[in-house]
Every structure is written in structure tokens, then in C-alpha cells.
């Protein structure tokens, strides 16, 4: 069985991959995340997920039997990608734009080894209730929005803003577990290898 590497610094992706009982090692990768002109959000997240996985594989010894998993998430409103806020004003503007509306969250997963690469993109729809200005300010003060796509974390304090979700909750957090498990199985990596409470 090949060794699995996660090409992501995201603690949320580490937690999600651990949740399905797959042993892995974290790889630190850096790629250019600038969108291409006229690139669709789906093509963007797929390109970045694959780029992270390929960069991770390139950092490993050439004779090592390994699979590398990469992922990328984008929050999309009216066809526009909302990245990580650059400052308080940017974060408050994002929350105001998302307030009382439905938006899309696209997460791409890529898995690559020495022979092949496979990807998938999962689209979910999230609906926010109206967010009051004082709530947006308090949320920014918490520090949570600073490094989050779209300026919020559905699994954190921003859960109180979520009036509805259609799609994959784990994908909105950062890694669609159903689709990730399917990809892993196609590369010969089963889930549930590390089960909590397993005494064997």
C-alpha cells in the first residue's frame, strides 16, 4: 500500500482526514494561487488542488511509493471568488455581501502518484441569515475570519449565520469525505485503518 501524504497546512483538512481513519503525513507546499483570466471557479479550485498534490509529490524521493492528496476551497458569490480577507474592511465587506443570501462553496480534491492523477470538484450551497453589522464586527474581533476563504468558518463561530446547507458539510469545511474516500480507494488506500478504540 502506498504511503499517503497531505499537501496542506490546513488544520481542518488534517482533522477531517483523521476522522475517516487514514494514516498520513503532512507536506508543506507553496504554489501560486493567482486566478487565471476568465478561469471558472471550478477550474480554479481543481487546478490548485492538483498543483498542490503535484508539488508535494515532486518534493518526495523519486523511488518512494507514495500518493499525495491536495485540496482547495473557494467561496463563490455571483460568480466571483471570495478569497481570504486581506484586512478588517475586506472581511466586513464579504460578510455584508453574504448576509441574507445563498452562495456556493466549491472544494476540489486531487490525488496523484507516479502514474496518474485524479480530481473531483464538489459544489455545495450555503444560505446565510441576515448578519447585523455589530455581529460582523464581533466576528472579526474573534480572529476566526482572517485565514478563511470567504471570511468565515462554518464549523466555528459562524455556524450561527448558517440558515441552510445543500451539499457536503465536510466539503464546506475543506475536504469532502465521501468523495475523498472514493478517490483513496481507487488508489488502493482504504479508510478506517486507524479506528478510535481499536485494541488490535
Swiss-Prot record:
The active site is at 72 (proton acceptor). GO terms for cellular component: cytoplasm. Pfam families: Maf. It is found in: Cytoplasm. It is an enzyme of class 3 (hydrolase). The record marks 12, 73, 155 as: Important for substrate specificity. Keywords: Cytoplasm, Hydrolase, Nucleotide metabolism. SUPFAM superfamilies: ITPase-like. GO terms for biological process: nucleotide metabolic process. GO terms for molecular function: dTTP diphosphatase activity; UTP diphosphatase activity. Its cofactor is a divalent metal cation. This is dTTP/UTP pyrophosphatase. It comes from Pseudomonas syringae pv. tomato (strain ATCC BAA-871 / DC3000).
Amino acid at each position: 500500500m502506498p504511503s499517503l501524504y497531505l499537501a496542506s497546512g490546513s488544520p481542518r483538512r488534517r482533522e477531517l482526514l483523521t476522522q475517516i481513519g487514514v494514516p498520513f503525513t503532512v507536506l508543506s507546499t507553496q504554489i501560486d494561487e493567482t486566478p487565471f483570466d476568465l478561469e471558472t471557479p471550478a477550474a480554479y479550485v481543481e487546478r490548485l488542488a492538483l498543483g498542490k498534490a503535484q508539488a508535494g509529490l515532486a518534493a518526495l524521493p523519486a523511488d518512494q511509493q507514495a500518493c499525495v492528496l491536495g485540496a482547495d476551497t473557494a467561496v463563490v458569490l455571483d460568480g466571483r471568488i471570495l478569497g481570504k480577507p486581506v484586512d478588517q474592511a475586506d472581511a466586513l465587506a464579504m460578510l455584508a455581501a453574504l448576509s441574507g443570501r445563498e452562495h456556493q462553496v466549491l472544494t476540489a480534491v486531487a490525488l496523484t502518484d507516479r502514474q496518474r492523477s485524479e480530481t473531483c470538484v464538489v459544489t455545495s450551497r450555503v444560505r446565510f441569515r441576515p448578519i447585523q453589522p455589530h455581529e460582523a464586527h464581533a466576528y472579526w474581533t474573534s480572529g476566526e475570519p482572517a485565514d478563511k476563504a470567504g471570511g468565515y468558518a462554518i464549523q466555528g463561530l459562524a455556524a450561527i449565520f448558517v440558515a441552510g446547507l445543500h451539499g457536503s458539510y465536510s466539503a464546506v469545511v475543506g475536504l469532502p469525505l465521501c468523495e475523498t474516500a472514493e478517490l483513496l480507494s481507487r488508489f488502493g488506500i482504504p479508510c478506517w485503518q486507524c479506528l478510535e478504540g481499536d485494541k488490535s
